Design a protein with these regions (language model features):
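Acidic, Ala/Val/Gly-enriched low-complexity intrinsically disordered segments
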Residues: 3-6, 10, 19
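Multi-pass alpha-helical transmembrane bundle typical of ion/small-solute transporters
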Residues: 14-17, 24-265
C-alpha cells in the first residue's frame, strides 16, 4: 500500500539529489537564471514542499522556540498574564509572515535566482525578528522585531511586483497586495517609533493586515495549489506542536527540580 506522505518525501529527496549530483552545468545555469514569475498550475500532480521552503520553516523554528521559551520563563515566574499578550503579538507576526510567504510560493514559486535571493532576504528578516523577541517580553520593546517583520514584508512586496509584471490576468491583484502591504508596514513603523503602539492600535493594524488579502483576492484569486498548501500547514503545525511539547517538558522538569519526591519503599 502506497503512502502519499512517504511518496512526497521520496520525490523531494530525489529532486534534491538530482539537483546536487546529476544536473548538468547547462541545466543548473538554466535553473538559476531569471525567469518570468508566471502563475503555477494549481492542479500540478505530486507537488511537494521544496528544500528552500523546508529551510524557511527550519529558520522559523528558531523564532517560535525563542517565543516559547520566553513564555515558559514568564509562567515559571508567575507572570503569565503579563507575558501572554506579548506572546500572542509575537506569534501573530511570525505566523502572518510565514503564511504570506507560503501562499505566495504556492501560487508563483519559480525557483529562479532572484526568487531564491528574495526568499533569503525574508529568512534574514525572520532571524532579526527572532533576535528581537526577548526585548518584547522584557521591556515591551518592539523595535527589532518590527524591523525584521518589515524586512520580510517588503521582500514579499518585491515578489508581488514581479508577479504583476508576468501575470497580466492578476496584475491588479498583485498590485493590491503590494500597495496594501507597504501601507500597513508604514503604519507599523510610525506607530512603533512614535511610541504609540498600544494593544488597541496593534489590533487595528492586525485587522488591516488581514483585510489586504481579502481585498486583493476579490479581483482575481491567485492560483494556489491545494495539496501544497495542506502540506505547508501540516509542517508548521508539527513545528508548533513540537514547541508545545518541549515547553511542557521544561515545565515538568523545572517542577521536579524544585521539589524532592520521596517514594516510600
Amino acid at each position: 500500500m502506497r503512502v502519499r506522505g512517504v511518496n512526497i518525501k521520496v520525490l523531494t529527496c530525489w529532486h534534491f539529489i538530482r539537483e546536487r549530483y546529476f544536473m548538468t552545468t547547462q541545466e543548473k545555469q538554466k535553473k538559476l537564471s531569471l525567469r518570468p514569475l508566471s502563475p503555477r498550475d494549481p492542479e500540478q500532480p505530486h507537488r511537494a514542499a521544496t528544500p528552500l521552503e523546508l529551510l524557511f520553516d527550519l529558520i522559523f523554528v528558531v523564532a517560535i522556540a525563542i517565543a516559547g521559551q520566553q513564555l515558559h520563563h514568564a509562567i515559571i515566574e508567575n507572570h503569565l498574564w503579563h507575558a501572554l499578550p506579548s506572546y500572542l503579538m509575537v506569534f501573530f507576526a511570525l505566523w502572518w509572515a510565514w503564511m504570506n510567504f507560503s501562499w505566495f510560493a504556492s501560487a508563483y514559486d519559480n525557483d529562479d535566482a532572484l526568487y531564491r535571493c528574495l526568499t533569503f532576504v525574508q529568512i534574514v528578516g525572520s532571524l532579526v525578528m527572532a533576535a528581537g523577541i526577548p526585548d518584547v517580553f522584557h521591556s515591551q520593546d518592539f523595535d527589532i522585531i518590527i524591523v525584521g517583520y518589515v524586512i520580510m514584508r517588503l521582500a514579499l512586496v518585491t515578489q508581488w511586483l514581479r508577479a504583476a509584471k508576468h501575470d497580466p490576468e492578476r496584475r491588479i491583484t498583485a498590485y493590491r497586495y503590494a500597495v496594501g502591504i507597504v501601507l500597513v508596514q508604514i503604519g507599523w513603523l510610525v506607530a512603533n517609533f512614535a511610541h504609540a503602539l498600544s494593544i488597541p492600535l496593534f489590533l487595528l493594524l492586525v485587522v488591516v493586515e488581514l483585510f489586504v488579502p481579502i481585498y486583493a483576492e476579490k479581483y482575481s484569486p491567485t492560483p494556489w495549489h491545494p495539496h501544497h498548501i495542506v502540506e505547508r500547514y501540516a509542517l508548521l503545525t508539527i513545528i508548533v506542536l513540537g514547541e508545545s511539547i518541549v515547553g511542557s517538558f521544561n515545565a515538568i522538569r523545572d517542577a521536579l527540580a524544585a521539589q524532592s519526591i520521596n517514594i516510600p519503599a
